[in-house]
């Protein structure tokens, strides 16, 4: 994976078509109850290119979906953590929201599989714990209920199907107030 001038991860269009189609097929047909041929047809990407990106395993494709959720949706990569440190919450949340807009089944995948007793479910629950740790690192004085409030606000913002960039701005301002009040590490710039 390469990064552009702003440090955003760049994956080509074929990667996203395959990932989006695999997540949709898995959600609609059931866990791993689809074929690579169906995936190729749906994504309009050749099987050889699918194998190049993901290998021959359907599970490896879904694991890549979990990786994307961790890095891009939850923001566990270095660049996104740095954005939080710089007080750029709106930018970080907007990137997560835009990903959900481009990958409409990502939310369903996450919500459906997070408690499944399999490798995907376990990985998603692990990402939740990592996000809780990230919030705790930035807001060390918050108790568990307050961290859950930040978590639910964050995921509500990015998963809400009727959100707009304008509504995101209002929600992010709320989170910025929480961070400015409780975080010794971050001094976000609040707009009036």
Predicted features and spans:
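Short, well-structured alpha-helical segments
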Residues: 16, 90, 94, 143-155
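Alpha-helical DNA-contacting segments of helix-turn-helix folds
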Residues: 61-69, 123
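Amphipathic alpha-helical segments used for helix-helix packing
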Residues: 94-122, 159-160
């Amino acid at each position: 994976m390469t990064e552009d001038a702003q440090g955003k991860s760049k994956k080509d269009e074929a990667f996203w078509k395959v990932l989006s189609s695999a997540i949709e097929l898995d959600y609609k047909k059931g866990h791993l109850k689809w074929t690579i041929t169906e995936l190729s047809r749906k994504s309009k990407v050749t099987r050889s290119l699918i194998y190049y990106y993901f290998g021959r395993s359907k599970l490896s494709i879904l694991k890549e979906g979990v990786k994307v959720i961790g890095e891009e949706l939850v923001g566990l990569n270095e660049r996104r953590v740095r954005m939080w440190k710089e007080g750029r919450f709106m930018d970080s949340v907007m990137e997560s929201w835009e990903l959900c807009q481009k990958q409409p089944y990502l939310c369903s995948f996450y919500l459906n599989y997070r408690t499944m007793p399999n490798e995907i479910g376990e990985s998603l629950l692990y990402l939740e714990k990592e996000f809780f740790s990230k919030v705790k690192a930035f807001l060390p004085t918050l108790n568990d209920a307050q961290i859950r409030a930040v978590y639910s606000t964050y995921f509500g913002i990015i998963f809400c199907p009727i959100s707009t960039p304008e509504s995101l701005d209002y929600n992010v301002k709320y989170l910025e107030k929480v961070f400015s009040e409780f975080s010794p590490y971050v001094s976000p710039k609040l707009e009036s």
